Amino acid sequence: MRPALALCLLCPAFWPRPGNGEHPTADRAACSASGACYSLHHATFKRRAAEEACSLRGGTLSTVHSGSEFQAVLLLLRAGPGPGGGSKDLLFWVALERSISQCTQEKEPLRGFSWLHPDSEDSEDSPLPWVEEPQRSCTVRKCAALQATRGVEPAGWKEMRCHLRTDGYLCKYQFEVLCPAPRPGAASNLSFQAPFRLSSSALDFSPPGTEVSAMCPGDLSVSSTCIQEETSAHWDGLFPGTVLCPCSGRYLLAGKCVELPDCLDHLGDFTCECAVGFELGKDGRSCETKVEEQLTLEGTKLPTRNVTATPAGAVTNRTWPGQVYDKPGEMPQVTEILQWGTQSTLPTIQKTPQTKPKVTGTPSGSVVLNYTSSPPVSLTFDTSSTVVFILVSIAVIVLVVLTITVLGLFKLCFHKSRSSRTGKGALDSPGVECDAEATSLHHSSTQCTDIGVKSGTVA
């Protein structure tokens, strides 16, 4: 009982907790086609703690050069005011500082400050001004933070002491290739879980390792992972041009399912695409059946379901024909447990068993999705040590009980052996006495015989 209590008391010491003043639900991320991703975090950290937090996520404290980098940061800021609700100006740590050997340069745009990670491709200085002019100094190290008006509009740079706390920080991540945003089709409730421990409902580009989950009609849950190859990246189980969830109609708009009247809108401010198994007609608005696949629009075929068992787990194969479903209730039902959401700064990710789709094309135009259930993976607190400790404790207790039992049996047998020997000795003593008496009687009878003989002789 005491070891178990001690283990329970030690659990909080090893279980990671969010940092002071963190607001993980307000964090957000964005990626550009160049392979750079940025994340914004609301947390009252010092400069060094902010650098460690970015490093823990696999990135560095962000620079904010002009051009695409500034636009990405601007997009993150304008996505929402954050936990303050836009009631005050916010400060965010960036990788801008002035070392001890550098002096204040009043005529330079950065006033003698420099970026920790210079960008050769985007070497132009940031267009942001200084909210307050830095103090003149050549002997004191100073840091700079990005000030955002009401937390959404960048106002400029502000000199700060590095040991002070700000309202948040910006991180930057660099990847060689990215996956484009998947086409949702009829999918809803999209959630992107990025490898730098942030989740988002929408990402134009996703780095390798990102997992996307969505709900299809009929409460069917699907997921896919961005996988990197030699020179490109793609979503696992999704062929180019396919969607996460098939549409119940024949038309697509920007990768999403649309109704027929919307697609045939006379304004012509968008283009129409056809679902799998159909092709766009000559008029550019109607969908026609592909001749080589010999599909018909009459009726709807019910999906077939084959369930087989493999050593890795149950695999469910679902075949969706080229025709589409008019009733969502006809879709096969699959129960899946997913855990998506924003994580805190520290690495506390835990995933539940997931079902990953693999799409296979057939000559008949059908699309087959293979859902394989993988075992749960725990990336944080492992309970195997607790199980081992309990098993070892039980084994020790059983060994002690067996030892005590064996000693008791040995002691009992020893006492029985001594008592049996004592009884046997007592029985042997009367026998000796009987033999002595018999010998004495025999000797007396012998004497009597001799006396009788002698008497006869005398007579």
From Swiss-Prot:
The protein's name: C-type lectin domain family 14 member A
Highest taxon of the source?
Answer: Eukaryota
Q: What is the lineage of its organism?
A: Eukaryota, Metazoa, Chordata, Craniata, Vertebrata
Q: Where are the transmembrane segments?
A: 387-407
Q: Which Gene3D superfamilies match?
A: Laminin (2.10.25.10), Mannose-Binding Protein A, subunit A (3.10.100.10)
Please tell me where this protein is predominantly located: membrane
Glycosylation sites recorded in the entry for this protein: N189, N306, N317, N370
Q: Where is the EGF-like domain?
A: 246-288
Q: Name one GO biological process term.
A: vascular endothelial growth factor receptor-2 signaling pathway
